[in-house]
Each structure stands twice: as C-alpha cells, then as structure tokens.
Curated annotation (Swiss-Prot):
Catalytic activity: carbamoyl phosphate + L-aspartate = N-carbamoyl-L-aspartate + phosphate + H(+)
Region (Disordered): 312-332
Name of the coding gene: pyrB
Source taxonomy: Bacteria, Bacillati, Actinomycetota, Actinomycetes, Micrococcales
Pathways involved: Pyrimidine metabolism; UMP biosynthesis via de novo pathway; (S)-dihydroorotate from bicarbonate: step 2/3
Name of this chain's protein: Aspartate carbamoyltransferase catalytic subunit
Physiological role: Catalyzes the condensation of carbamoyl phosphate and aspartate to form carbamoyl aspartate and inorganic phosphate, the committed step in the de novo pyrimidine nucleotide biosynthesis pathway.
Length: 332
C-alpha cells in the first residue's frame, strides 16, 4: 500500500491486516509509557485546508506515539490564504523533506491529485476530502464494531461477515457514509442507509448497500449497530427537510428508539454531534454508545496506517516491530 486515499481501495485481506495491526497498537497504548520507536527520524505533515479538531489531533497523537516529528499546517494564516496553489504547497513540503502527508481538503479528489500528480514523493493519507472519502474514519468504525462484536476468540483475523449496520441521516453530504459503505461491505457486513430522499445522493442505488426511508423499520430489523450521521448544516442552503424538529422526530435517535434495539446493538456517531437533532443526549450518553471509544480507537487505527505506510507494516521490509525498542519495551 503506497497511499491511503479511499476506503474503496482496500481489499478484504488488506483491511483486516490494518485492523489487526491497530489491535497491536491499542495493546501498547495501555502502558504507562505509550511512545514507540518505529518512525523516529521521520516527519509527518498534517496539511489541513478544512477545520478539524478530532482528526487532526488524532493523527498528531498517532504520529508522535510512533516517535515521528509532526508539522501541523493550517490553510488559515498560511500562503494558501494568499493564493498559493495545492501544487506549490506540495512542492514546498517536498523540498522540506516530508516523509508522509496527511491531507484534509474541501475539494473532493484533492488527496488523489496530490498523490498522483508527481508533486511530492511521500505517501499521502486522505483525512477527508469534500463529500467524497474519509478512509481512516471508516477503519476506526470497523475496528470498533469488530472489537465490540467479537466472539470468544477475539477480533484478530476476523471480518464483519453476517453483521448488519444501519447508517442514518445526512448521506448526501457525508464522506463518512460513503467510506463506511465501501469498507463495511468489503468486510462482509450488510449495510442499510436510512435518510429522507432529499439527503440521498444521485446514484446511491449503485452503492453496495440497501436504502430505506423509515428509521423505525430499520431498527425493527434488528441491526448490530446504528450509526448516526451529523446533519451538516454548513453545507446546506435550505429545503432539505421541513424543520429541525421534524427531522429529529423522523430520523433522530432518541431513548425510545434505543430501547427497541437488540441487546448487544451499538450506537455510533463519527462526531461532532448535534445533540437534540440527529441524536438525543440520552442516546449519545447511553451504555450502548461507542462515541468516546471511537475517538480512542482512532489513534490506534491511525498509528497502524502510518506504521504500515512508513515502516513497512507487519509483513513489510521494516525490521522494527510496533512494540520494540526502549520506549515501548517488547511486543506483548
């Protein structure tokens, strides 16, 4: 794997290998000293053209826990705000010796352009591009599902075959929905999208999933997890739904709907949440909720991605294992 640009680029075995590596990383993060040596001497650049809190901090934590140096670049206040192009920015990073670039961009396809235009030699990781893809979010969601739903033998080596995940809400503007449909279906899960017709994209019938319009019917189908999507009001003008109150009534997950879920069903949300709109406070804070766990797992998953791309991964040419060295001790 040279870059991570789209969840659709991952095959089943490749995805499972990343998730297994993330399990190893997660095990090391329970230690008093969490820092590991594999990326010592390498520089990871977080190149963010859109505002972000969780994703940027998560990538920064992941890189630093692998001993990489991190440069955080924000478009605001930089030469980009003065009109510098993506090409010029990339060539500047190349000249400075960036070993990996994590990019978030408002334009769909920008990370792919950066990776394949020949402007930079470093691996590129897509941290979200427009309404297109967010592959590490899909990986951390799959990691959370696999870990929480694992059988007695644990999650290592397993996929999500036979599981049913319902994804609810603003699919039209959601790169998380697209990435999860791609990855979860690759891992064998059945995925159902539930949204008002106005918040479904053109061509959704060609996606590897089912589509419905009734949240209550989807809950009654007994899914293993319900993933709520943030209503992205900043990407909307008007007319997508009659009112926020009506949206919450028809498509919001509240305590009553949570109570009808199966005994082991999970409540997920990629964050940030609009409490009281797509999810109630009771649902978000319930024992079924994995919202905080997803944030924790995001660091382990992003460590696995950086390790795989920059250190050769568990089956690559690197002679350094994730848990070796003075900072980390030995791999458990």
């Amino acid at each position: 794997m040279r870059h991570l640009l789209s969840a659709a680029d991952l095959g089943r075995d490749e995805a499972v290998a990343l998730l297994d590596t993330a399990e190893t990383m997660a095990d090391t993060q329970s230690r008093a000293i969490k820092k590991l040596p594999p990326l010592r001497g390498l520089t990871v650049v977080n190149l963010f053209f859109e505002d972000s809190t969780r994703t940027r901090i998560s990538f920064e934590a992941a890189a630093k826990r692998l001993s990489a140096d991190v440069i955080n670049f924000s478009a605001k206040g930089s030469s980009v705000s003065k009109g510098e192009s993506l090409k010029d920015t990339a060539q500047t990073l190349q000249a400075m010796g960036a070993d990996a670039v994590v990019v978030r961009h408002w334009a769909s396809g920008a990370p792919h352009r950066l990776a394949h235009a020949g402007w930079i030699a470093a691996p590129v990781i897509n941290a979200g591009d427009g309404t297109h893809q967010h592959p590490t979010q899909a990986l951390l969601d799959a990691f959370t599902l696999r870990r929480r739903l694992a059988g007695p033998d644990g999650p290592i080596g397993t996929d999500l075959a036979g599981r049913h995940v319902v994804v609810v809400g603003d699919v039209l503007h959601s790169r998380v929905a697209r990435s999860n449909v791609d990855l979860l279906s690759t891992l064998g899960a059945r995925v159902t999208l539930v949204a008002p017709p106005t918040l479904l994209p053109v061509g959704v019938e060609s996606w590897p999933c089912e589509v419905g319009y009734d949240l209550d019917a989807a809950i009654d189908a007994g899914p293993d997890a319900v993933m709520m999507l943030r209503v992205q009001r900043e990407r909307m003008s008007s007319g997508f739904f009659p009112s926020e109150r009506e949206y919450a009534r028809a498509y919001g997950l509240d305590a009553a709907r949570v109570s009808r879920l199966g005994k082991h069903a999970l409540v997920m949300h990629p964050g940030p949440m609009n409490r009281g709109l797509e999810i109630s406070a009771d649902a978000a804070d319930s024992a079924r909720s994995t919202v905080v766990e997803q944030v924790t797992n995001g660091v382990s998953v992003r460590m696995a991605v950086l390790y795989t791309l920059l250190a050769g991964g568990p089956d690559g040419d690197s002679t350094t294992s994730p848990g070796s060295g003075p900072e980390g001790g030995t791999t458990p």
